[in-house]
C-alpha cells in the first residue's frame, strides 16, 4: 500500500505520481535519450550562486585600497594572500590562503544602488531567477534521480526556526516570464521537510521497484488517454519526482560526516549579544547560524545533479552603521567572518572531492559600498562597483580580472555588467551553440541566454 506520511493521502500520491510521469516521462526517469531531448543541452555542471544580500563592500572584501586616503581604504586593514601582490580585506584571512584557487573581478558593477536582488533576479533576466532559465530549457528535475534542477535555499532549510526567504526587495524564487512551475524548488517551507519527501512503502514492494514503476507507467497511460491530468499542477509533479528519485537524503545534513559539518559550521564564530542592539539582529543570527551549513547543503545538492542553487542567508551586508545595521568593522567581524569561513570550507571540501571542474561558485551582492566612509563609520549604497568572486569550472586560478579606479568606486578597465555574469552562469550550464539551433526555445529565454558575452578573461 502506497502512502505518504502526515499530510499526503494515497489519492494525493497518485495525483502527484501521474502528473510527474506525464511531465517527465518514465523513460526519462530511467535514462534521457533521443536527439531532440533538451536534456542533451545540459552540461551536467552546477552553478552555486551565493547572494550577499544588502550589498557587500568591495574595500573590506577583495579590493582594500590601502594606498588610498584613510577616508577610503579598508577599515579592517588588509591581509596578504598566497598570490604575490594580491591583498584582501583584513577579515578575509581564510580565503587569503586559497586565493590561488579562484578569481576576483574588480570591475563588476550592477549599476544600481537600490536594495533589489540583482543579479540573481533582475530586469536583465526579465525578472526570473537565473536558474529558471535552466528549468525552462531542460526541465525541472534531473531525469536520472528526480533531483530538482533549480533550488533556492534559505536559513530554514538547514536550521530549524530560522527564517525562510526575505522577499522585501524581490522574490528570489520568481520565474519571471515563465510559469510558476519553473520557479526554484525551495526546501524548508513546509514544516517536516525531510519526512515530507520520503515515500513510505512496505519493504517487499520497495524491493520490487521495477514492478512499481511499471504500475505507475500504466496509470500514466490511462490518464493520458482520458485527459484527467488537467488541473494537476507542476508542484505536485515536482514533489513526485523528488520522492521517487529518493533524493530527500541530499537535503538532510544529518547524513553528512560530523567532522565535515563541524568544518563548515559558522554558528560558533559570533555571539548574539554582539549585535543585539540592532534592529536587524535576527538577520545576523540567521546568517551566523546557517551560512556554513547552507554551503554544505549546496555541495550535497551539486553532487546529486542539481544544476542551479541560490544560497542567501538574510539581509546582512547593508553596513550603514545605523539603528538597523552594523558598521563596517563590527559588520565584517560578524558577517564577513562567517562568509570567509564558509566559502573557504566549501573550497577546501570541493577540492578534496575533486569537484572543482563540476561546480561554479559565484559570490556577489546587489551593489557595493561608497568609497567614502560615512560619519558613523559605515559605508552607504553604491552601484558603481560590486565585489565578485568566481571559483570552479572554467575559472582561472589565482587571477584578478579588471581593475578599479584609485578611489575604488568605479571600474578603471572595461566594466563587467550583470548580463555578462548571467551569460557566464548559463554558458556553464548549457550548450549554447546547440541551443541556438533549436526552434522551441522561448524568445525571452533566447534573449537572456544569448544576449551578452560571458565575462572576458575566463577560460
Regions picked out by a protein language model, each given a short descriptive name:
Residues 1-459:
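Ligand-binding pockets and gating/stacking loops
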